[in-house]
C-alpha cells in the first residue's frame, strides 16, 4: 500500500532538501554526472534565479495589488494534469511500482538531459513531467504578457530573462509532446485581474522551479 499523497510529498521534498547539505554530500560516493544532465541542472538554476528576480520585481511594482505569498490565493495550474512529484520519486522511496505515477509514458525524451539510451523509466517519466509543467506555464505567461503589453499604463510585463530561461530548459529537455493550445480571448482584458493572476502564477511557478531544481540536483548526483 502506498503512503498518503500528502505524507509522500513532504517526505520527498525533505529527502531532496537533504541533498543540499554538505554533511550528507561528504558521505555520498562521488558520481560522474553526465554532461547533458549537468547542463540541465545549470538551466534549472538559471530559471530559479530568473523567476525569483521576476517575482521580487512584481511584488515591488504591484505592492498595492496584494502580491505577497500571504495575501494571494494560491493556485496550481498543473493540478490533475501532471504528476511531477510522483514521477520524480527518488529510488530510495520506491517500494513498489504502484507508488509510481500510474499513467503510461506517451512522451519520448531525447534531449540533452538524458545521458544515454539506458536512462531509466523513472528518469524519463520525471523529465517528461517537468517538461509538461514548464510548457503549461510558458503558455500561460505568454498569454498574460500579451495582455500586459496592451495596458496603457505599461506598469509591468514579464522579464524576458525568465521567458528565455523557460525556453532554454525546454529545449534541453526536448520532449516530443503535443503542443499546448493557447486560447485567444476576444474579451477586453481586465488589467487589474491580470496583474492579480500574474502574482498568483509567479508565486506558484517559483515553488515549482524550486522543486525542479532539486529534482535536477538529485538526478545529477545519482
Swiss-Prot record:
Signal sequence interval, chain numbering: 1-25
Gene Ontology biological-process annotations: immune response; interleukin-12-mediated signaling pathway
Keyword Glycoprotein: yes
Domain of life: Eukaryota
Glycosylation sites: 42, 96, 110, 183
Gene Ontology MF annotations: cytokine activity; growth factor activity; interleukin-12 receptor binding
Keyword terms: Cytokine, Disulfide bond, Glycoprotein, Growth factor, Secreted, Signal
Cysteine pairs bridged by disulfides in the record: 40-113, 67-199, 88-126
GO cellular component: interleukin-12 complex
Family matches, as Pfam families: IL12
Compartment annotation: Secreted
Xref: Gene3D superfamilies: 1.20.1250.10
PANTHER family cross-referenced by the UniProt entry: INTERLEUKIN-12 SUBUNIT ALPHA, INTERLEUKIN-12 SUBUNIT BETA-RELATED
Subunit structure and binding partners: Heterodimer with IL12B; disulfide-linked. This heterodimer is known as interleukin IL-12. Heterodimer with EBI3/IL27B; not disulfide-linked. This heterodimer is known as interleukin IL-35. Interacts with NBR1; this interaction promotes IL-12 secretion.
Family stated for the protein in its record: Belongs to the IL-6 superfamily.
Functional note: Heterodimerizes with IL12B to form the IL-12 cytokine or with EBI3/IL27B to form the IL-35 cytokine. IL-12 is primarily produced by professional antigen-presenting cells (APCs) such as B-cells and dendritic cells (DCs) as well as macrophages and granulocytes and regulates T-cell and natural killer-cell responses, induces the production of interferon-gamma (IFN-gamma), favors the differentiation of T-helper 1 (Th1) cells and is an important link between innate resistance and adaptive immunity.
This protein's name: Interleukin-12 subunit alpha
Gene (UniProt): IL12A
Amino acid at each position: 500500500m502506498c503512503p498518503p499523497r500528502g505524507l509522500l510529498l513532504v517526505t520527498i521534498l525533505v529527502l531532496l532538501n537533504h541533498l543540499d547539505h554538505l554533511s550528507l554530500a561528504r558521505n555520498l560516493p562521488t558520481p560522474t554526472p553526465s554532461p547533458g544532465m549537468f547542463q540541465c541542472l545549470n538551466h534549472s538554476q538559471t530559471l530559479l534565479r530568473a523567476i525569483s528576480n521576476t517575482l521580487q520585481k512584481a511584488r515591488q511594482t504591484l505592492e498595492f495589488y496584494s502580491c505577497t505569498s500571504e495575501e494571494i490565493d494560491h493556485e496550481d495550474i498543473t493540478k490533475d494534469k501532471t504528476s511531477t512529484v510522483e514521477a520524480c520519486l527518488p529510488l530510495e522511496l520506491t517500494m513498489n511500482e504502484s507508488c509510481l505515477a500510474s499513467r503510461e509514458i506517451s512522451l519520448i525524451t531525447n534531449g540533452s538531459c538524458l545521458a544515454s539510451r539506458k536512462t531509466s523509466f523513472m528518469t524519463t517519466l520525471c523529465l517528461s513531467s517537468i517538461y509538461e509543467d514548464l510548457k503549461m506555464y510558458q503558455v500561460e505567461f505568454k498569454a498574460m504578457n500579451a495582455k500586459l503589453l496592451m495596458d496603457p499604463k505599461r506598469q509591468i510585463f514579464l522579464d524576458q530573462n525568465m521567458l528565455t530561461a523557460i525556453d532554454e530548459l525546454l529545449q534541453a529537455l526536448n520532449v516530443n509532446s503535443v503542443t499546448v493550445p493557447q486560447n485567444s480571448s476576444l474579451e477586453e482584458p481586465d488589467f487589474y485581474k491580470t496583474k492579480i493572476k500574474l502574482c498568483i502564477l509567479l508565486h506558484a511557478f517559483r515553488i515549482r522551479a524550486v522543486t525542479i531544481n532539486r529534482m535536477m540536483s538529485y538526478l545529477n548526483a545519482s
